[in-house]
Amino acid sequence: MEIRQLQYFVESARTRSFSQAARTLYTSQPNDSKAIQQLETELDTVLFTRSSGGIELTEEGKIVYLYAVNILQNVDRMNELLEERRQTHPISD
């Protein structure tokens, strides 16, 4: 599982559209869909129901969404803390 897969998944769930998520994340829709399919394969579950009207989270997808949002928030916070640390404690040779 990769962070980018979780980003695509969360944005797709928020927008209910793979193509809109791809635009928001400055990627291509085929890459977005492939990342979601890989995530579904890895988790051995279907995360979205797909129809001509768009996409909807499955019950399993709703569970994954809650955890994915939390994971991404924690990654963002970790990066913020590390950046603060670099500013106050620069690495010296």
Description of each model-found segment:
Residues 23-24, 41, 62:
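Alpha-helical residues within the helix-turn-helix
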Residues 8-12, 64:
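Short alpha-helical "packing" element that flanks the helix-turn-helix/winged-helix DNA-binding module
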